[in-house]
């Protein structure tokens, strides 16, 4: 099977080279693979990508869901190559698989654009990416906290281990608070899920941990943390004895808690901006063949109850 796949990739590469000059006038078919649409934020990107693609003429989007499985994701890439798509947009499940996937795409001469999760192990300038500066996201959380309190006990809820978003958002928080009086007592991965975050936080409280700050790598885990804290009789806020909770994404559910004052702040990364910028970059990459790196802006949203 592997031999036939490589043969087919060679044929696709030849055809792709001969047709590249005509991509601007023909219908362009783009495969878009979402890492896991059970992730609320990724589902919003999916919806916005579909909506934005309607404004583009001669563009067909084939959206696939890897369901959080790196093996499934690689199979989806292979299937899209066999279908002869003009380009692949990829939100990586595991950035450690970047090399194998990138090699497949290069062998077929099909351009690939990574979005939301940056690849690992690829040379700078040798790939295309659209997404946030993830370390800056964590820094923004910490900066917002330090404007209110310069000391206290913190915990961090981390996304899937090994992903750039989880690692760099966590590093961003740590880098900013290193010279402050804020001490990190615990950090644990809840893999973006609110139910796992709820259980983790309840266990921390049950163990007697005294928490002043919860830094969460995304809104869903922050929501789970708030649910766990409330179930344990804790109060969210900025007064003495109250807990400040920070999220990322500004999802509708997260914004509801911002408006209620239960989440102190979230970092907004606009899903429509990510979807539209990624699709535009993919089309440009198909037509021009020049690698693109674009970092998108993030914005701190603080609950109006604390302004």
Language-model region placement:
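Hydrophobic alpha-helical segments within soluble ligand-binding/sensing domains
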Residues: 73, 129-154, 196-198, 250-254, ...
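Flexible loop/hinge segments that line or gate small-molecule binding clefts
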Residues: 95-136, 251-259
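Bacterial signal peptide processing site
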Residues: 18-20
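Periplasmic-binding protein-like
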Residues: 31-33, 85-92, 111-115, 155-156, ...
């Amino acid at each position: 099977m592997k031999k036939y796949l490589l043969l087919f990739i060679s044929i696709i590469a030849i055809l792709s080279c001969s047709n590249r000059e005509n991509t601007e006038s023909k219908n362009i078919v783009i495969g878009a693979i979402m890492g896991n649409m059970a992730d609320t934020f990724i589902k919003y990107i999916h919806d916005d990508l579909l909506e934005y693609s309607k404004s583009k003429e001669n563009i067909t989007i084939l959206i696939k869901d890897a369901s959080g499985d790196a093996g499934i994701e690689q199979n989806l890439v292979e299937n899209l190559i066999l279908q002869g798509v003009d380009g692949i947009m990829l939100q990586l499940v595991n950035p450690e698989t970047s090399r194998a996937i990138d090699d497949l795409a290069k062998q077929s001469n099909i351009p690939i654009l990574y979005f939301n999760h940056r690849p690992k192990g690829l040379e700078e300038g040798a790939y295309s990416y659209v997404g946030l500066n993830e370390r800056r996201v964590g820094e923004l959380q910490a900066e917002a906290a330090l404007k209110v309190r310069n000391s206290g006990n913190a915990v961090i809820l981390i996304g899937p281990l090994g992903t750039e978003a989880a690692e760099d958002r966590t590093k961003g928080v740590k880098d900013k608070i290193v010279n402050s009086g804020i001490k990190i007592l615990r950090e644990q991965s809840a893999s973006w899920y609110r139910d796992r975050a709820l259980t983790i936080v309840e266990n921390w409280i049950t163990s007697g941990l005294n928490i002043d700050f919860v830094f969460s790598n995304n809104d869903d885990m922050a929501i789970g943390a708030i649910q766990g804290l409330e179930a344990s009789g804790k109060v969210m806020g900025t007064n003495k004895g109250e807990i400040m909770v920070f999220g990322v994404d500004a999802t509708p559910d997260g914004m509801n808690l911002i408006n209620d004052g239960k989440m102190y702040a979230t970092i907004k990364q606009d899903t429509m901006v990510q979807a539209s910028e990624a699709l535009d970059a993919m089309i440009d990459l198909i037509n021009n063949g020049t690698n693109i790196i674009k970092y998108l802006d993030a914005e701190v949203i603080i609950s109006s109850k604390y302004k």
